[in-house]
Amino acid sequence: KTDFAILDTHNYGGIKKYHLVTLPLALHGVIAKKDGTVVKVNVGDKPGDPVFGVSDLLIHLSGEQLEKKAAKVIEGENLDLLIGSIPMQTEDEKVKEKVKANIMNLLSKEYGIEEEDFLSAEIEVVPAGEAKDYGFDRSMIMGYGHDDRVCAYPSFEAMLVSENPEITSVCLLVDKEEIGSVGASGMQSRFFENTVAEVMAAAGSYSELALRRALANSKVL
């Protein structure tokens, strides 16, 4: 594997792993550097960007693989992202993984990041390219994540176009739904209830009973 630079990944939520093989992939996310600065990462979507991928066996080498069930054709541990194959041109014998060294050199020049910075990074691997109209009649959308986006975007758009609502309106956008809504920003947390309590306190009308009544009188779409 030292002939290639590979990112070790972990699949997020329930996915059909074989969908991601030999597909152009992009990197989205943020990297928090040791000096505290945050670098935004978005590589693979813009014209001229490189893309990345998960390699697969050639057809004449995949006889055993093709006998497996769909759930086992590509294991989660095999969803490693291929990001480069050119070794660094150096005579330094201390540099053992020359392809990796070359990639890290490129990342240092482009983003000013080091290998240790990946410890505080949150990067997701997604299909490259923008969402597109699907079908001659353009009646559908082809793009990843639209089981959630089809709900999130109309909700946010409705908030933007609403004028003088009779009651307080809230658009609640959360994540981690795919893995059980856990974490500080998932629905199992109390951040929404805490936010309502803070708003009520700022308005001078907070009490535990008033908070419970406000939540009980709310309507959710």
Spans of model-derived segments:
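N-terminal hydrophobic/helix-forming segments and targeting peptides
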Residues: 1-221
